[in-house]
Structures are given as C-alpha cells and as structure tokens.
Amino acid sequence: MGEPVVLRTTRLTLSRPVDSDVDAIFDECQDPVIQSFTTVPSPYAREDAEKFVALASHWWDEGSELVWAIRDAAGLAGMVGLHRIKDGAAELGYWLAPGARGRGYAAEATTAVVDFAFGPLRLERLEWHAVVGNTASARVAQNLGFQLEGIRRRGLAGHGPRVDGWIAGLLATDPRTPQPWPV
C-alpha cells in the first residue's frame, strides 16, 4: 500500500496510529467493554500497545491491514480498520474509547473507511463480525447497510471459550441504507 492515507470527516481525523498514541491506546484498552468485545489482549499491557503501533505501521507498508486512529479535538477517540484485506474483500473492525461513545463517532469514522474501501481500494465486499450481544457495534454496521448473514456458532475466539458471533456483509453494490436485523 505504501504511504498511510489520512481520512477526514466533519469532526474527526483518521490517521495511522503512531508511537505518541501508545499511552492513550494502553489507557483506553483497559476498558472492560473493549476487552470483552474485541480481540485485544486481556489483560492489556503497555507492551501490547507498543506492539500494536509497530504492527499497524507494518500492515500499512504491506497493505494487508489498514488501521486508523480515530482522533477528535481532544485526542485519541478509538480505532477503525480494514483487516485481512485479500481477494477484493476485508473485515471492518472498530472500537471507541468510553469517553467518545454516544457522539456518533463510530458511524462517522466507519462511513469514511467504507467509502475508502469501496472507492480508492476498489474492494467488492466487507464483512463485519461481532460477539453476539454487542448491540452497539451491531447498530453501527446495520446503519451502514450491512446485511446480517447469520450467527457463527462458537465462531469467535476470545479470552476464554469460543463464543457465538454475528456475521454481516456489505457489497460495493449494496444500498448504503439501514437494514432490518432481527437482533
């Protein structure tokens, strides 16, 4: 991929995480919601944040994953990324810091990333996965136009036994309007 791409929205700047973000990433990843609903290590150590920032840079260089720090006027608000980019598809993932939730940041940041995925990246399909019960993440995906494709029984590895996971998909040709989900 090469040089990291900066995305801007009305209120946010999305840019590659850098070394100066390590302390904020470490602090935010102490949140039990982030640890239970994402793939971050649990417990989360400062070294995990350091490794993540180094990996994010490597992923950008090779184009396998594109991860952006979500930044508002106050600083780091969360992360959003396109993971496992291959054969015209990727997985959309995101988390928000507790203090950034409830402001519409997830919708704003993910919309910018989806636009980039289907625009300049020319991807054909995005997938979204979440632990069954992560309704906040589900609302974001549903409002982006993702269609719920089912439940993957024991489909997600976490910080203990495997858990059931929702899976949804969005094609470049799909309408980007909220979809009805039975959840």
Locate the predicted segments by residue:
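Terminal output helix/cap of sensory domains in signal transduction proteins
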Residues: L55-H58, V114
